[in-house]
Amino acid sequence: MERKAMSEIFFFILGIINSIILITIFLIRKSNLDRLQRYGKFYFLLVFPAAVNMFLVFHENGDTRYVIFLALFLAFLLIEWLYDYKFKIGFRENWLKNWKWTIPYLGLYYASNYGFVIMPWKTNITWGIIMMCLFVIQIITNIRSHPRIKS
């Protein structure tokens, strides 16, 4: 059995935490927007473990793809913060009307989640399956939590 690098284990754990937090956010969003406004900003604390994970990858001379996917994740967190807290852009309410804001957001969302599935998958198939299942749950809760667009 091959020993896994600390950065790979850390990345897998970060992916699990990210998915669980997003699933929780989507579930809260459906029922209690006030609570989401109060507690949703704690999601941004994932910046710190992501930065530590980047350091671990560099320290271990790890796979550069981890750094790329971590950078995409950090970019996603940045755009999420800018849209929701800095500029207060309500692009989620009508993403067809606000497509210029939605496209980069969704691109980074899917790219970072792709990384959280594919990188653990290449390390350990069980890890990959766990991450894929969490991502599917994330997508389902995301779709169900957002209002339907009225034409």
Enumerate the language-model features and the residues they cover.
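Membrane-helix boundary elements
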Residues: 37-67
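Hydrophobic alpha-helical transmembrane segments in multi-pass integral membrane proteins
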Residues: 51-61, 105-123
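N-terminal signal-anchor/start-transfer transmembrane helix
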Residues: 6-32, 135
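Membrane-embedded alpha-helical segments in integral membrane proteins
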Residues: 1-2, 22-27, 49-58
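Cytoplasmic-side transmembrane-helix entry/capping segments in multi-pass membrane proteins
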Residues: 35-46, 70, 93-102
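Membrane-water interface at the C-terminal end of transmembrane alpha helices
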Residues: 23-25, 83-87, 111-121, 133-150
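A cytosolic-side transmembrane-helix exit/cap motif
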Residues: 33-36, 60-61, 85-97, 143-151
